[in-house]
């Protein structure tokens, strides 16, 4: 892998060096052709020895320059220049043709991007002062889509009549409802009371000592326990009847029923029979 990478790098740099050499040769050829054109232009004046200079520089018309006469100047000079210029230009064009094609191929293969350096040191920056109205106007001009949506589509001339352009009447906002909050009663600090106990006011009654011998406060499971009347028992007797012994009521009811049966004269018929027997006897 290392050898292949080195070969690829060597090939890359070799191609780059070839490209630079070809660019230098093409620049030299262009400079030579430019110099030949300038010398030909200088020797085209009539009456001065232009043919001699042109023949010496081009190398093609040396014989023409030596055989020309100084007296006639205009015709010989023009003939020498035209011949020299034609040969030199055609020769330069022929030599520059294949080199130009090779350069274009290399440029297509390797394109080097040279960033252009721009000097901004001479710029003078000033503080921008733009009002808000101008900003809004510029935004409206730059964003026609927003105006299209807000205005219902385009300008007034572009609007078309139809059911889709009917604007709904603007409804007035409802009046704000004022909610009156009832102030909560002041709570005593340090004591928590549930909501149910906050509203009810309880009066504290004087509470005496507990009645130890009362069955209501201290009920006993013994059937032979003595019942001691207390103040609460007396108060309860005033309102309703207190049943102290479960069998007493039944005994009283049975006695009453027995008395009622005894009060009935069940032997009245027998007594009449006795009286009748006594009479017959």
From Swiss-Prot:
Biased composition (Polar residues): 214-225
Modification type Phosphoserine: residues: 8, 131, 155
Phosphotyrosine: residues bearing it: 120, 213, 267
Bias-annotated ranges (Low complexity): 27-45, 157-170
Modification Phosphothreonine occurs at: 4, 205
InterPro entries with a match to the protein in the record: CDV3 (IPR026806)
Signal peptide range in chain numbering: none
Tissue: Ubiquitously expressed (at protein level). Up-regulated in ventricles of juvenile visceral steatosis mice.
Region spans: Disordered: 1-257
Location in the cell: Cytoplasm
Amino acid composition bias (Basic and acidic residues), ranges on this chain: 1-15, 103-119, 226-254
Modification after translation (UniProt): Isoform 1 and isoform 2 are phosphorylated on tyrosines by ABL1 in B-cells.
Pfam families in the cross-refs: CDV3
Keywords for this protein: Acetylation, Cytoplasm, Phosphoprotein
Major localization listed first in the record, in broad terms: cytoplasm
Domain of life where this protein originates: Eukaryota
Residues the record lists as N-acetylalanine modifications: 2
Family: Belongs to the CDV3 family.
Name of the protein described by the UniProt record: Protein CDV3
